[in-house]
Amino acid sequence: MVVASEIAKVASKTARDIAGCFTCQCGTQFDNVERIVQHFKECRYRDETCKDDDIVVYEPSSFVQDEKKDKPIIVEAASEATSEEACNSSKERQLPALSALSALSTLTTSANDDLWTARLIWQSTNDTKLDNSPSSNYTDLNHKLANYGLSILSIHALMCVECECLLNVIHTAQHMQIVHKLELNEDLLWFQELRTLKLKSPTNVLQTHSSQTHVYPYIRGLPVLLNGYECVPCTKNGTGFVHAIMDTFRHHVRRTHGKVIKLENCIRRTALQTVKNKYAQRCQFFKVDYVPLNGGEEEEEEEGEEKEDAQNIKERMVDFCFSKFMEKNQQRREQQDKGENKKRQDDVDQATDNNTNTILEDDEKDNDEEEEEEIVNAREKNLLNQQFNWTAIVKKLGENWDQLVRFEYTNGIVTLDTIVNQLIRYYYRGFRHLSGMTMGMRRMFTQGGSYSAQERGLCRLEQKDTVVRYAQSAALYLIFLLRRPSADSGIRRHLEAMCGATVERKEGGSNSSSNISNVANFDSAEDDNDNDNDNDRDSNNNNNNNNTNTDDDDKLAYLELHEALKLAFLQQYDFSKNVQDLEIMEFLACMSLHKDGTSKYAYEISACFAPLIYTCRLVAACELQRLIDEKQIDLLSIPSFQTAGSIAYAHVFCFITLGQRNLYDVLYETQKVVRDIIRTEGYANTLQGLSPSTVLFQPRSNSMYPCIGDAFNNMVRLDLSELTALYEGMFAKVQDLLKELCFDMNVEKLLPISLLRSIGDDINNSKLGYSFFKESIEIRSSHSVLLRTILKNSELCHRFFPSMSKKDLTKLFGGVSDQQRNECDNYSNHYNDNSNDNDNDVFLKLHWSKSAIKKYETKASIFNELLFCLVYISAGQPARAQEMVYWTLRNGKYKTRELYLMFGRLMIYSRYDKTRNMKFAEKPIPRFLSEPLSILALRYYVLVRPLEALMKYVTTADRSKVAVYLDFMFVIAGERLQRDLPYRIFPKATYQCIQKPLGFRNYRHIAHYFKEKNIEEEMTRESYFDLQAGHTRNTALYIYGRTMDNLHYLPSDYFANFFRASYKWQELLQIRDNPTHGLLVETKHPFIKRVDQLEEALNEKLARLVGEQMVEGDKEKDKTNEEKNKDEVKAEMTQPVVNQDSHDLQDQLATTPTAPTAFHYRPGLLQPSQTSVQHCCWALSQYYGLEAKFRSLKQFQSVYFSLLNRMNLITVLPTGGGKSLSFLIPALIEKKRQTPGKVMNMVTLVLVPMMSLRQDMMLRVNEKGLLVCSGNWTAFKDVRLTLETQLPDLFILTYESALTNSGLRFFESLATLGRLARVVIDEAHLLLTSGAWRTALSRASRLSGLYAPLHLLSATFPRQLEMVARQTFCTNFYVLRETSTARENIFYFLHPYDNTEFLLDLRTLMKRTKVFEGDGRAIIFCRTKKDVEYIHRRLHQSDLFAHTHVTIYTGDVSDEERQMNFDAFRNANGKTRIMIATKAFGLGINYMGVRLVVHYGLPASSMDYVQETGRAGRDGKYAIAALFYEKYDSTWSSYVEDSMKNFLNDNTMCVRSFLASEMDGECVCCASFANCVYCSRCSDSLLGEESTVSTMYGVKPTLPETPKPAIATHSRYNASFSSSPPPQPGNSSGMSAMNTNTTSTTPVSLSELSEITLFPSSVSPTWKKSFGNANTNLKYGLEDMSLSHRRGHKRTYDEHLNNVQQGVNHDMNRVHGSVGGMSGIVGIGIGIGDGDGDGDVDSRTIHFAEYKSRVQAVKKQWVDSTDISAQLERFFRVYKDECLSCTLGNPDTEIRAHTGKACPVRLSTCYKCGKADHNLRECKLRIRFQGLCLFCGLTKFEHADSDMAYTSDCRSWARKANLISLVYYAWNNVQYRRTIADKFLQGDVRDQAFYGFVCCSTTTNSAFVLVIHYLLSDVLQIM
C-alpha cells in the first residue's frame, strides 16, 4: 500500500502555513519535498508493494491557496480543499482512498503545538455532527464504520457509539472482539489498515484538554457531567481544578486551601466531560461549553432548478426566519443559563411588605388550604380547655385580649415592620451558622431529641415565604411580650437598640433590601420570582452566599436582636410556677380564639407551634455559635455539651432539653396534645360520604360562587357523574379553544394521535434545554405552521396585519431570500451582534395589530387555565397547586423538566418538594394524562406556543420575555401561572361547568374518598394513588395528611404502577377514547389462581363421587353454559361504578311507568276542590269570625293557589285587599294537617322590606295566636334540622337578614327536607326597583333555588315589572291582578301648594274625612326628613292644631322611638291623630282608621304615589288622598319621574286613568267604575262634596261597610257541593294577566266559590309552566291539577327523589267532613270524582322537573354575572403593560411605556370630573360609595378571598388596573359620555346621575365593571 508520506507531497501552501513542515507517518518532519522523497526510500513504514516510480511531486501551482488571507479561517476549509486535490490525484494515480485519508490526518495532526494551530483545530469541533458531509473524505469510511457502531468525529478521533467512549485506533479490532463479541474474520485485515489513520488517541485528547481553567467545546457522543464541581479560588489564581466526585473535591480543598475557606465558598457547579478509556486508571475531567448547536440549516438550491415563485419564497423565508427566531431564543436562554448568573430580582423587604397584616390569616390556614367558616366545635373546645384551661387564661387578660395579638405595633422607633425585617436577616444569618456545623452537631438541636438515619437535624428553611411567615410569628410573640403590663424591660431595651441601629444604617445610605436578597440567595423554587428570565430555582444545591460580612450597624442590630430573642425564647421556669401563668401559655390562649371569642379548631391552632419551636431551636444554635466564636467552648468538648454543669449546657442546651421546665418543653408538650386532638377532630366535618358515588362537601361561606338549590345543612351534594361532566365540559371548551387558536386547521392530520407513540424521549437526559420536542422532525417542522397560515389566509392576514397588503408581505420576505445563505453561514456572528439584532429582524418590521395579538393572548390564557384544571382533575390523585405552577417543559439550569413522554401519554414527573425539604430525599411522582388530553396538550405546545412566543417578542421587542413560553407548562397573560391564581381559576371553572364551586381542598378530599370507595381494594401500605396525592397510605386512612415515607429505590415497574393508578382514575371518570394499547395486563394473583385451580379440582372430584354419567354433547353444552355464565358475571363485575341517582331526571322520567288512573280527565274548565274550599273558609273564620267573606275572587284565588304549592304567583291587589291572607291561611291549614308525633310543621318564609312592616305583621299574627312566628332565623342556626325539629310556622324577615349566604343556606336545608312550604316576598316591587335593596337583589335570584314556590305580593306592580321578575328569579309567574290599582273608595285630590293656605286646607280635609272623630287618623308624607321637621314645627306652632297630637316617623329616629310613635298613632283610644313621615311609613302599614293621606310635595314615582295613598281607607270607607305640589317640582325637579310631571301638567288626565295606565297597562277612568268616588279632575267640586257626588252618580255618601276587612263566608261547612263540573258560564274571570275584565269587589260567599271556574278553557303559550287545564298540563310542563300535590312532609329530600325515580305511588289521604278532625295530607280534587288517583308520582315529577329547570336557570344567570368580572380580570392581566387611558382616548395608538398613573393625558386633569382647572382635593363633586369597595370599585361578590376587600390594603385586580379612574376618564371623554348615558342612564348625561349609578351596588357586578366591559367589548371591540 501507499504510505502517508506519499500523499504528504501534495500538501498545499495552506497546509504549510498551518503545520510549518511535512510529517511522515514515522513521525519525522521535513521542510521541503526533496528531503521527504529521500526519506521515503529509507523509511521502515514503506510498503513493499510501493515502488519509487510511484512517488510524484506536484507543482505548487496545483496547490489550493487562500488569496485573501495568509492563514485559513477554519481548518475544515483547508482540509477539504486539500482533500479534494488529493482525491483527484488519487483517482488519476488510482491510489486507495484510505491513503488519502491518512495524508489528511497527518496534515491536521501536525506536531507544531503553537496556539494558533490549537485554536483552529478546536474551532473545527464546533461542528458537533459526525463528519458525514458530502464533501468530506470521511463520508465513505464512516458509512462502513457505522456497521460496527464506530464513527470518526470531527476532532479526528475514533468513537464507539455504543460504549460512548473514544478508542485508540490500534486497539479497535481487539475492542470489537472482546467487548462486543464480534468475529472479524474477513474484516480483520480492514481493521488493521485503520491503524494507518493518524487519528487521535484518548490520551492525546486528554492532553489537549489538560488545562482545567479553559473551557472547551464539548465532544458530541460523550457524556456530559452537568453538575461537576469547580474550585473557585483555584480558578481565580489561574491554576484551576475541576472534578466530578465530591469526596475528591473535598480532599482537594482541605489539602490545597486548608480550613481557612469553607467548602461552600469554594464550590461552583460547572459542566464537565471525561474521555472514558479502558486502560485509564484515573479519570481526568475538563470543563466544556455545553451548548449543542441545532442543525437544520437550509439546504442550498441545486443548480439547474427552476426559480421559485414569490409565494414559495415567502413561505420558505417565513419558516427560515421563524426557525432562526426560535434558535436565537434557545441560544440566548442557554447562554444565560451557562455562565451569567443574573442577580435575583425579588426583594425580601417587598415580600415582607406584601405579607404584612396577614400573620393571623397565615397562622389560621395551611399553605395550600382555604379558610374554613368560623364555627365553634364544642367537643374540641372542651378537650383543649380540659388540658390547658385557655378560656380562663383569656378571661384574666381582660376584654381587650385581642389587642395583645394584634399585628400592628408602633412605639417610638420600635415598629413591627423593623422587627420582622431584622428577624428575616437573623434567620438567614442563623442558616449560615447551621451550614458550618456538622450533621452530628445539628442533630443535637433535633426536635424531641430523637432522629432517624435520614434526619439532618436542625436545617435551614427552604422556602422564602416560610421564612417570612416564621419571622412574623416570632415578631408577634415579641410584640405580645411588650404589650403585657409586666413586660420585661430587657426585651424592650434590646429591641430599641436594634431599631436604632437599623435607622442609622438606613440614614447612612446602605441598602438593606439588597443585603437581604443576597443573604436569601438560596431560596427554594416555590418562592422564585425569576420574572421568567431564567430557570433558576435556587435551592441548597446552589447557596453560594457571597455577602458573608456585614457592617458594624448590621452586626450591632444582630447582636441586640439576639439578646432580645434569648430573653424571650431561652427561658427556664421554676417548677413551682403555675403553667397557666406563663407568658407563652397566655400567648397560645389568645391565638386559640377567633376575634369574636369563639374557639378555633385544633388544626388551626397547630400552625402556631412550628414557628415558635423552630425559632427557639435556632436561637439556641446561634447562641452556641457565639460561644464558639468567643472561644468560651471548644469543639473538642462536643460530647460534654449536653452534660449538666458544662458551659454549653448552661447557656444553650438546658433551654432546648425536654423535661427541664423550659419554654421549649411547654411548646413541645402542648403541640403533642393538640396533635392528638387533631386525629379525632378531622377536618371540621367538611366531607360526608353518602355512597361510593355520592358525597356531601362543605363549601366556603364567603365564596363568590354560591351553590344554589342543592344545600343539605350547609353542605352540597356531589355525584361521581358530576366529576365526569366536569371533565367533559372543560375538555369540550378546551377543544373549541384550540380550534380557534389554530384557526380551524386540521390539526389531526398535521399532528396525528400516533405521534404520541412515535416520538422518542430520553428520560435520563439531563442536557440543558433538552425536551422531547427536539426529537421529532414533525414537531420541529410544525413550529411555523400557524404563522404561515396567517400569511396565506386573506382574512387572517388582514386581522393581524391590517395596514399591510399581501404584496408588501411578499416583498418583505422576498428581500430576506437573497441574504439567507450568508445569514446561515454567519449565524453565530449575526447573533452576537446584539446591536443590530432588532433592526435586522424581519418580524419587527411587520405592522402587527396589537388588538388582534391581545385577543389571541387572551384566548390562550383561557386555554391554559382550563388545561391546568384538566390536568389537576384527570392525571390521577390531585397534585399541589404550588408545585404545579412551576412545572416546566425542558431542562433548566438547576432542575430537570416535568413533562415527559411514556406509554404513549404525556407524563408529568414531578418531585415532591416538601419531602425534599424535610427529609432531604427525592420523591418522584409520575402522573399520566389521558390520551385525548395528551394529544390536545401536545398540539397546543407544538403549534400555538411558538406563535405566542413570537407575538410576545414583536409586542415587547425583548427576547427575555419569550423564555416563559418555552419553559413553563402553564402561561397566563405572558407570565408563568402565579401561585394565587389556581385558587381563583379552579372554583370559577367548576362553577361554570357544574354550578358547584369546588375548591382545591374540597376536591382533594373528594378525590381521595372516591378512590377509596371505588378503586383501592387492598389495604396495602404503598398505594400509588396516595403517593400521587402526597401522603402515605396510613395517613390517608386516618386524617388526610401531608407527610410521606422515603422511597429507597425505583423498581422496574414503578412507572407502570403509576400509569395503572392514573388510568384507573381516568376509567372511574369515564374518560372516553382512552385505550391502553395493551400496556396494562392485569394478571391474576398467584394465590387466587391457585385457589381457582383447587376449586376446579374439587368440583371434578365431587362430580365423580356423585357418579353423574353425561354424554359428550351434554358435557359440551354444560361447559358452554358455564363459560357463558362466567363471562356474564365477569362483565358485570368489571363494569365501572355508575351512580344511578345521578342520571338526568328527564331521561329517567321518560321511561318511568305510571299507574293507570281510576278516571279520565274531561277537557274543559277546572273547578276547585270542595274540601279545599272548606278548609280555606274554615281558616278564614279563625281569623275574622264565622261571618267573614273573601273580599274578591282574586283574593280567594291567591289563597287557593298558594295552598296548592304548585306554581309561582304574583298577586297584585289594592292596598287593604287582604294580600297577607294568601300565606296566613295556607300556613294555618298546613299546621292543622300535620300528623302529631310524626312530621312537624311546614314553614313559610315571608320577606318584607322594612323593620316597621315586620313588626306590624308579627304583631297582627301574634294577636290571633293561631300561628307561631319568628323574626330571627339565627336562633335556629346551630340546631340540627330534621323532620322532627320544632320550628316556627312563619319566619318574617327583612330582605337584608334573609338574603345572606348563611341565611339562604339555612332555608335551603329546610327546603331540602321538604319543610319549606313557600317563599313570600311582600312589597316585591321595592326589591326589584328600589336602590336601597341592591345588595339583597343581587342574591334574590337564589330564592328560586329553594325547593318551594315563590309568591310575590304588591299593591303597585306595573306590568313592566313582570318581565323583570321573570328575569330576576329565572322562572315564569302566574299573575293575579285586580283590574284597577286605584281604589274606588278614595277621593284623589290634586291642588297646587300654597304656603299660606296649606294648614287651613289641611284642617278642612281632616274635617271632611272626620279625622277628629272616633279612630280617624291622617298621614302626611314628605319627601325629605327636613320637610318632616318643617311640617311638624308648623303644626305645633299653629293654633289650628293646638289640641291635636302629632308624631313623626323617619330614619333618624331610633327604633324604640319609632315603635313608640307608631303604637301611639295606632292606638284607637289615643290622642295622636296625625303622623308625619317619609315614604318608609308607606310600606305595608295596616291600620284601618286612616281617613286622610296628604302628600307634601310630589312623590318620586307613580308606584310611590299608589303605595302611599293606599294607606287610606283600608276598611273600605270613604277616604281622601290629597296631593299638594309646587309648579317647580312638576316641571324641573330631577328626582320626579317624567311620567309624574306629565300627569300633573296635563289637567285633563283622570287620576285613575293615569294610575291604570302606569300600573295595570289599561285605559280606564272614573266613569269606567260602577261604584266609585270621582277624582278631583273628574268632579266639578273642589273638594268632592259628598252630597254633590251622591246626587250626580247616585251613590251613598259613604261606601258600603264591611265588617272587618277582607273576608267572610257562611258558618256552614257541611254544605252539599256537586262533584260534577258545573255548566260553563258565559263570562268567567280569566287567570291571564292580559284579561282586562272588571271584577266586582262584592264579597264572595261559600256557595259562590263552589261554582267558581279558576282556569280558562284555553291557555296562552306565553305562560308556559304557569297554569293550564287538564289537556294542556303536559304540553306546557305543568303538573296535573286533578291530582293531590303532596309535598315531602314525611320523607326527606332523598327519599322523595328516589320515590320519583322508582315510580312509587303514594296513598292519597282524603279528608271529608269537619276540619276539626283533619289529619294527614289534604287532597285537592279538581274536576274529578270521588275515586283516588294514582298519578301523584307524575304530579310531583313534573313539579320537581320545573324546579330543576328553575335552578339551572338561576345558576346560569349567576355564572353569567360573575363571568363578566372574570373576563375583565383576564383582560387587564393581558393589557397590564399598556396604558388603557391612551387606548380609550385613541384605540389605534401604539403600546405605551408608561403606566396609567403616569399617563400625560391624565396628569393634567382632575381625577373625578376630568377638568383641568383644579385638582382632586379642590373638586366640588362629592361621591359616596354604597356596597362597593372604596379602593377598587368592586362588590364583595367580585372579590377573591385574598384581596382584603374594603380595606386600604385591597389587592384586587381592579385596584391594580385603576378601574375607578379609568371609568371616570371614560365618562369625562366626550366620545363615550353619550354612549354610556344611552346604555345605562336612559340618556341622562348629568354627572350626578352617572356617579349615582356607578358608585352604588345594584347587582352582583359592580357598575364600574359593567361600564368598562361595555366599552371594551361592545364599543371598542377589543375584548
Curated annotation (Swiss-Prot):
SUPFAM superfamilies: P-loop containing nucleoside triphosphate hydrolases. Residues 540-549, 1626-1642 have a biased composition (Low complexity). Residues 1401-1559 form the Helicase C-terminal domain. Keywords: ATP-binding, Helicase, Hydrolase, Isomerase, Metal-binding, Nucleotide-binding, Zinc, Zinc-finger. Its EC number is 5.6.2.4. Residues 360-372, 524-533 have a biased composition (Acidic residues). It catalyses: Couples ATP hydrolysis with the unwinding of duplex DNA by translocating in the 3'-5' direction; ATP + H2O = ADP + phosphate + H(+). Residues 329-372, 504-552, 1110-1135, 1613-1643 are annotated as: Disordered. ATP binds at residues 1213-1220, 1240-1247. Residues 1200-1375 form the Helicase ATP-binding domain. PROSITE patterns: HELICASE_ATP_BIND_1 (PS51192), HELICASE_CTER (PS51194), ZF_CCHC (PS50158). It is an enzyme of class 5 (isomerase). Coiled coil: none annotated. A zinc finger (CCHC-type) spans 1804-1821. Residues 329-347, 1112-1131 have a biased composition (Basic and acidic residues). A motif (DEAH box) lies at residues 1322-1325. It comes from the Eukaryota. One of its GO terms (cellular component) is cytoplasm. One of its GO terms (biological process) is DNA repair. Induction: Repressed during various growth conditions, including nitrogen starvation, and by heterochromatin. Repression is strongly dependent on cul4, raf2 and raf1. Derepressed by histone deacetylase inhibitor TSA. GO terms for molecular function: 3'-5' DNA helicase activity; ATP binding; ATP hydrolysis activity; nucleic acid binding; zinc ion binding. A probable ATP-dependent 3'-5' DNA helicase. Has a role in telomerase-independent telomere maintenance. Represses ade6 at an ectopic site. Belongs to the helicase family. RecQ subfamily. This is ATP-dependent DNA helicase tlh2. It comes from Schizosaccharomyces pombe (strain 972 / ATCC 24843). The lineage of its organism: Eukaryota, Fungi, Dikarya, Ascomycota, Taphrinomycotina.
